[in-house]
C-alpha cells in the first residue's frame, strides 16, 4: 500500500467524498459527516477545503474543513478513513496535514466515542468540549403508540409545502435555535439543498400553524427516514423539533414530537432515533418521558 495525503483549497471531488462517507456509514452504522457537511460538499461551499488520502486512484480517507459562519477563524472538521485502510496511520497523516493548513480554532467531530478518536485528539492537543447523544426508542408494536398529541388552543398541524413555507420556516427555526451552533444558521440555500435530497419527504415535515393564519408557523417537527442496508432495517429520525420562543411552555414541543413519532410509526418504521446535546436537560427530560433511551455519543474536540 502506498497512500498519498494531499491538501486542497476547495472540494474538488464531491461525488467521491460522498461515496467514501457512505462506505464508512455502511461499515460503522453511523455517518462520518453531518448533513450540513454533506450539503457543503455537494454545493462546493466557498471556503470549504479538504485533505484527501489516496491509494493509487482510490480515495481512502479524507477530512473536510468548513469555516463557521458565526465564529471568525473557527473551522468545523470531520474526518473518515475507508474501512480497509484503518489502523495504518492514514488518519494520523491526514490530521498532520490539517494542523499545517488550518489557521484558527478547530472544532472536530468524532462520530462515536472511540479510543482511536480520543488518541488522535490527544496527539494534536484537542480537548473534548461537547457530547451529542443519540437516543433511540422502539415504535413497532409499542403499546403507547400512537402517542397522545395535545395541541394548544388555536393551533393545528399540517405538512410543509415546498415553495410556500420556506421563509416562514427559516424565521421560526432561527428564533427557536438562536443559540444552537448548527441548526440555527441554516440558510435558504441549505434548506433547498435538503429539499432536493432523496430522503426529503414533505409529508414528514410537520408544521404547527395558527388556525386563523395557516401561513404563520409556530413550530415544527422535521422527520427523516434513513433507508435500510443489508440486515439493518430503515430507521426513523426526529431530525429537528423547534418551537417559537413565544410558544415555549405551551406544550407545543411535546405535541409536535409525539405527532412526528406517530407519523414515523405509520410509515412502518421499527425504531426512531434523535440527537440531543448531553447538557440540554429540558430536552433530555422530554425525550426520556417519551420512551427514548441513550444509545450512542458523538464528541466534539476543540483546539
UniProtKB/Swiss-Prot annotation:
Q: What class of enzyme is it?
A: transferase
Among the GO biological process terms of this entry, one is: mycothiol biosynthetic process
Pfam families according to UniProt: Acetyltransf_1
* Entry EC number(s): 2.3.1.189
Q: Where does acetyl-CoA 1 bind?
A: 79-81
Q: Which reaction does it catalyse?
A: 1D-myo-inositol 2-(L-cysteinylamino)-2-deoxy-alpha-D-glucopyranoside + acetyl-CoA = mycothiol + CoA + H(+)
Q: Name one GO molecular function term.
A: mycothiol synthase activity
- InterPro entries assigned: Acyl_CoA_acyltransferase, GNAT_dom, Mycothiol_AcTrfase
Residues given in the record as 1D-myo-inositol 2-(L-cysteinylamino)-2-deoxy-alpha-D-glucopyranoside binding sites: 35, 182, 224, 237, 275
Positions bound to acetyl-CoA 2 = 241-243, 248-254
From the record, what ranges are coiled-coil? none
Q: Give the UniProt keywords, A-Z.
A: Acyltransferase, Repeat, Transferase
Q: Which PROSITE patterns match?
A: GNAT
Q: Which SUPFAM superfamilies match?
A: Acyl-CoA N-acyltransferases (Nat)
Start and end residues of each N-acetyltransferase domain: 3-152, 155-303
Self-association state and partner proteins as the record states = Monomer.
Protein function: Catalyzes the transfer of acetyl from acetyl-CoA to desacetylmycothiol (Cys-GlcN-Ins) to form mycothiol.
- Similarity remark: Belongs to the acetyltransferase family. MshD subfamily.
Q: Which PANTHER family match?
A: N-ACETYLTRANSFERASE
Recorded protein name is Mycothiol acetyltransferase
Organism encoding this protein: Kocuria rhizophila (strain ATCC 9341 / DSM 348 / NBRC 103217 / DC2201)
Lineage, broadest ranks: Bacteria, Bacillati, Actinomycetota, Actinomycetes, Micrococcales
Amino acid at each position: 500500500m502506498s497512500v498519498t495525503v494531499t491538501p486542497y483549497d476547495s472540494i474538488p471531488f464531491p461525488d467521491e467524498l460522498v461515496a467514501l462517507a457512505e462506505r464508512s456509514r455502511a461499515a460503522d452504522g453511523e455517518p462520518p459527516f453531518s448533513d450540513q457537511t454533506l450539503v457543503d460538499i455537494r454545493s462546493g461551499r466557498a471556503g470549504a477545503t479538504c485533505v484527501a488520502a489516496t491509494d493509487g486512484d482510490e480515495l481512502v480517507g479524507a477530512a473536510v474543513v468548513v469555516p463557521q459562519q458565526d465564529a471568525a477563524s473557527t473551522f468545523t472538521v470531520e474526518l473518515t478513513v475507508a474501512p480497509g485502510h484503518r489502523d495504518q496511520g492514514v488518519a494520523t497523516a491526514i490530521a498532520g496535514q490539517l494542523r499545517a493548513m488550518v489557521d484558527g480554532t478547530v472544532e472536530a467531530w468524532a462520530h462515536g466515542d472511540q479510543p482511536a478518536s480520543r488518541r488522535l485528539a490527544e496527539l494534536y492537543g484537542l480537548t473534548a468540549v461537547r457530547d451529542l447523544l443519540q437516543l433511540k426508542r422502539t415504535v413497532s408494536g409499542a403499546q403507547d403508540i400512537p402517542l397522545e398529541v395535545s395541541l394548544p388552543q388555536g393551533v393545528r398541524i399540517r405538512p410543509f409545502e415546498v415553495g410556500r413555507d420556506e421563509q416562514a420556516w427559516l424565521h421560526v427555526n432561527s428564533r427557536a435555535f438562536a443559540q444552537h451552533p448548527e441548526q440555527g444558521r441554516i440558510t435558504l440555500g441549505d434548506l433547498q439543498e435538503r429539499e432536493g435530497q432523496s430522503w426529503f419527504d414533505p409529508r414528514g415535515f410537520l408544521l404547527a400553524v395558527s388556525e386563523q393564519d395557516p401561513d404563520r408557523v409556530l413550530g415544527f417537527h422535521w422527520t427523516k427516514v434513513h433507508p435500510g442496508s443489508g440486515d439493518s432495517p430503515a430507521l426513523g429520525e426526529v431530525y429537528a423539533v423547534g418551537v417559537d420562543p413565544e410558544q415555549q411552555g405551551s406544550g407545543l414541543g411535546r405535541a409536535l414530537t409525539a405527532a412526528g413519532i406517530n407519523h414515523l410509526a405509520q410509515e412502518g418504521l421499527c425504531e426512531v432515533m434523535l440527537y440531543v446535546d448531553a447538557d440540554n436537560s429540558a430536552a433530555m427530560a422530554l425525550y426520556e418521558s417519551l420512551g427514548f433511551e441513550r444509545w450512542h455519543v458523538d464528541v466534539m474536540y476543540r483546539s
